C-alpha cells in the first residue's frame, strides 16, 4: 500500500495553467519575467500607453513651470538690481523702496517655488517612465492612510487634553474644598 502512495506522489500532474512557470529558454531577459537583462528585446516592445500619456502630459507642464521659474527669477533679479540704488538715493521715501524690495523678494521666492515644482514634476515623470515610483492610486492610498493616522493622532491628543483639563478641574475642586474645610473659625458650606 505504501508503494502505491509513493507512486501516486511521483506521478502528480503539475501542469496547472493558472500558475506561471518561469521559462528559462525565453529570450525576454532573466528568468522569463520580462526583465531588461542581457537577452532583452526591449527595443521591440516600446513604451506603454501610460508611459506615452505621462510623457505627453508631464513634459509640457514641467517645461512650462521651468520656463516660468526662469522668467520670474530674471525679473526678480532685475527688480532687485533696480531697487537697491533707488533705495540708496531715495532713502527718505522708505515705503515705496520697501515695497519694491518686498516685491523683489516675493518674486525670488515665487521663482524658487516654480522651479521646485517644475523639477519635481519632471522627476516624477521620469520615475514614472522608469517604473520606479508608485502608481497614483497607491500614492492616494498612502495619503489617505497618513491623513487617517493624523486624524486619529489629533483625536487621541484631544482626548488626552480633555482628560488633563478634567483632572486639573477635579484637583482644583479638591484643593478648594480642603481649603474651605480646614480654615480655622469657618464652618463648612451647606451646614
From Swiss-Prot:
> Where are the annotated segments for Hydrophobic?
55-128
The chain's disulfide connectivity reads none
> TM segments?
52-72, 99-119
Top-rank taxon of the source lineage equals Eukaryota
Q: Where is this region: Polar?
A: 2-54
Coiled coil residues, start to end: none
Give the membrane topology, semicolon-separated if more than one: Multi-pass membrane protein
Modified sites of kind N-acetylalanine:
2
Subcellular localization is given as: Lipid droplet; Membrane
N-terminal signal peptide? none
Q: Name one GO biological process term.
A: response to freezing
Any one GO CC term of this protein is: membrane
Q: Which UniProt keywords apply?
A: Acetylation, Lipid droplet, Membrane, Transmembrane, Transmembrane helix
Q: Which family does it belong to?
A: Belongs to the oleosin family.
Q: What does this protein do?
A: May have a structural role to stabilize the lipid body during desiccation of the seed by preventing coalescence of the oil. Probably interacts with both lipid and phospholipid moieties of lipid bodies. May also provide recognition signals for specific lipase anchorage in lipolysis during seedling growth.
The name on file for this protein is: Oleosin 20.3 kDa
Amino acid at each position: 500500500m505504501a508503494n502505491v502512495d509513493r507512486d501516486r506522489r511521483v506521478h502528480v500532474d503539475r501542469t496547472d495553467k493558472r500558475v506561471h512557470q518561469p521559462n528559462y529558454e525565453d529570450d525576454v531577459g532573466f528568468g522569463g519575467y520580462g526583465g531588461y537583462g542581457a537577452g532583452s528585446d526591449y527595443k521591440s516592445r516600446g513604451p506603454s500607453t501610460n508611459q506615452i500619456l505621462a510623457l505627453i502630459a508631464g513634459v509640457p507642464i514641467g517645461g512650462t513651470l521651468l520656463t516660468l521659474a526662469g522668467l520670474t527669477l530674471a525679473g526678480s533679479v532685475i527688480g532687485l538690481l533696480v531697487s537697491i540704488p533707488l533705495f540708496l538715493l531715495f532713502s527718505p521715501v522708505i515705503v515705496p523702496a520697501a515695497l519694491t524690495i518686498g516685491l523683489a523678494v516675493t518674486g525670488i521666492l515665487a521663482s524658487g517655488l516654480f522651479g521646485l515644482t517644475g523639477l519635481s514634476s519632471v522627476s516624477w515623470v521620469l520615475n514614472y517612465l522608469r517604473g520606479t515610483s508608485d502608481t497614483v492610486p497607491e500614492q492616494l492610498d498612502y495619503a489617505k492612510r497618513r491623513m487617517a493616522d493624523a486624524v486619529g493622532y489629533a483625536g487621541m491628543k484631544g482626548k488626552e487634553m480633555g482628560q488633563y483639563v478634567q483632572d486639573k478641574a477635579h484637583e482644583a475642586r479638591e484643593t478648594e474644598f480642603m481649603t474651605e474645610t480646614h480654615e480655622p473659625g469657618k464652618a463648612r458650606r451647606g451646614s
